[in-house]
Amino acid sequence: MLSRSVRPSLKPWRKLLLAGVAAIALTACASNPTTTGAIGDQPSTGLAGKQAAALSQLAQHYKKNPGDRATILYYSAALRANGQAGQAVAVLENGVTKFKDDREMLVAFAKALAASGQFERALNIIDRAIDPASPGWNELMVKGAILDQGGKNTQARSLYAQAMKIAPDQASIHANLGLSYAMTNELDKAESELRMAVKMRGATTQVRQNLALVIGLQGRFDESRSLFAAELPPDQVEANMAYIKAMLTQQNRWDLVKQQG
């Protein structure tokens, strides 16, 4: 296990958390654009093409009817998934003006704000979506992810714990908790949570890939590569392994892995 005195760069983990709470599959059959979705930054060429086509179609729908609730939610989620957080914020600012007390709209707006780096504003918005008397697990998890991205990991984990009491078998909660531990270099705890997550309802390929990532960052490259290979084509597997080794090299952690392995 790596020394906890060596802190990893937070940027990659923030990106994964953001994707974990914000991204959706850009397809017409996506059932709910405000729930947890795919984690992953390198879609295959075929999938990327489908995403571009879906985004273009949603943009046309939005242009024709910018006040339609479903179109606002799906289009903004598609923009977030495509890395266009600023544009998603603009779309959702109009949405929350029209649908002021709509919890799904508020959650989507909070995600877009967080994706654009506006963490304090995102927290203010997500608080409007949380009913203190009956909080939803998804809203609590989203707030936790926003806090994690702002470096408030202890507060974030408290919210994940609350969310788990409401929905104990939700993979996305354990996955986000695992990434929270990864942000503070507690890779053993991160692995434990992600291993639980992959066995639960709602576990996605992205959750399994994040487990592979955490294992790889502990220097267990063969196991990491095997897990990636079950989810991705060979070229993406090797790209991910190169990324992991680059992270370790950049953070001077590979020497520690070899010393402590």
What is the predicted function of each stretch?
Residues 69-70, 103-104, 135-138, 153, ...:
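Helix-start (N-cap) detector for alpha-helical repeat units in TPR-like alpha-solenoids
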Residues 74, 108, 141-142, 176, ...:
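Canonical tetratricopeptide repeat
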Residues 2, 22-82, 86, 90, ...:
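N-terminal leader/linker segments that initiate helical-solenoid repeat arrays
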Residues 34, 205, 211-261:
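Terminal, low-structured helical/coil segments at or just beyond the last alpha-helical repeat
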